[in-house]
Amino acid sequence: NAVIPTEPDNDDVVDPPNDNDSGSQSGGSGGTPSAPAAPQTAPENGDPCIPILFNGKSVNAGTAVESTRNDQTVTTIVIDSEKLNDMLVGESELAVITIPVVSTADVIVAELNGQQVKNMEDKQSVLEIQSDRATYTLPAEQVNISAISQQLGESVSLQDIKIQIEIAAPTTDMLSIIENAAEQGSFALVVPPVEFSVKAVYGDTTLEATHFTAYVERTIVIPDGVDPAKITTAIVVEPDGTVRHVPTQIKVIDGKYHAVINSLTNSVYSVIWHPQEFSDAASHWAKDAINDMGSRLVISGTEDGLFTPDRDTTRAEFAAIIVRGLGLKTEGDSPVFADVQSTDWYSSIIATAHAYGLISGYEDGTFRPNEKMTREQAMTIIARAMKLTGLKEQLPDQSADITLQSFRDASAVSAWALNGAADTVQAGIISGKSANTLDPKANMTRAEVAAVIQRLLKISGLI
């Protein structure tokens, strides 16, 4: 797969860290400066009666502005500050403000000011933008208006900052990049790509929020006539043509099929068909998980259509698979461990896993990427991923000793891995090497990795 980093064909396998649980941390939703947006044309209308749904109740609180930008038509719905504040006052937390937009424009924009976003954040409210091709569900706290305010300068009033949440068709140039990526990656685009973005505009300065601290949901409508059984996943396509899987489910919503996508970043998304079957997994116990993860671009084969399911996994391979499975964007290749060089194929992957708190390495500052991954090491890393997906907080409070008491070799689990092992067992991601053994020191095979990553995503409700 030309646009997806592949795992090296070697017999080295994995081990996890002697980890002190550093906890998960994401890249944050801080704004990234970008070039100022092209000026909009004068509005063709200013309809003050666009309905906005507040917890399902319709209130005329939006004004529609039609414009053009870079040869694309734009419909902007500007939310009335006074009416939004009136709706928020006295309401309980977790309100959902829905903006249904009926428009054929290339770009759909919901526009609020920074103070409105701050008021919504204080109420833990969620903003939902609906168009005929996609829906974007954005918790107000993920805009991170405080970080945006700091970047623009604290002298700038929140009232004067425009927050623009967009659902857009890609530009002609970006569409060409996407089509080329599909050809190079041997997958078929099932629906037209959609770009999701969040921008903060103040004067001539535009900041773009590219990263979130929790998974943010968006849906893409599957057109009539498309077989939902011939969809394997949604993907993100970057401006340089690189592609990554993002966790995706196919659901029926209001009588139509939708791809429900959860991601920690904004970008251009599409839905693809990429069936994958590995010949040496045809009769393997993990066949379904292996082929599913392969079809989703999470795992790749070794050579000649083989997966070598019973080969042990290296630490670098495990890091790659969990980063891909979670849909994390790899950024930067500055080594964070003494034994990882910027020229190594796994350099940016390991840096990303470290940045998200998934791995911490050894006390001597090494990661030992070509050593084999043990089961207890893998359980520790997966438990950290559970924090990122929100699964950890759903577990009932129970001691590790009680959780693991049914395994006769529970005492063999290292002290640093005890809580991680208990969390993964309690969540149902790890069920034991046998009915009553964990075998924590055993190496983890490629088949086992495919199975546990699939379980992590399924039990977290992401696929």
Give the residues covered by each predicted segment:
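Proteolytic cleavage junctions
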Residues: 1-21, 32, 38-39, 46-50, ...
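Short Lys/Arg-enriched alpha/beta "domain-start" segment
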Residues: 43, 48-85
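Proteolytic processing hotspots in large secreted/extracellular or virion-associated proteins
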Residues: 69-240
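Secondary-structure transition/turn motif
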Residues: 81, 102, 132, 261-267, ...
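C-terminal, surface-exposed recognition/capping segments
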Residues: 233-234, 416-422
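Feature responds to low-complexity, polar/acidic, surface-exposed segments characteristic
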Residues: 247-254, 263-288, 300-316, 322-349, ...
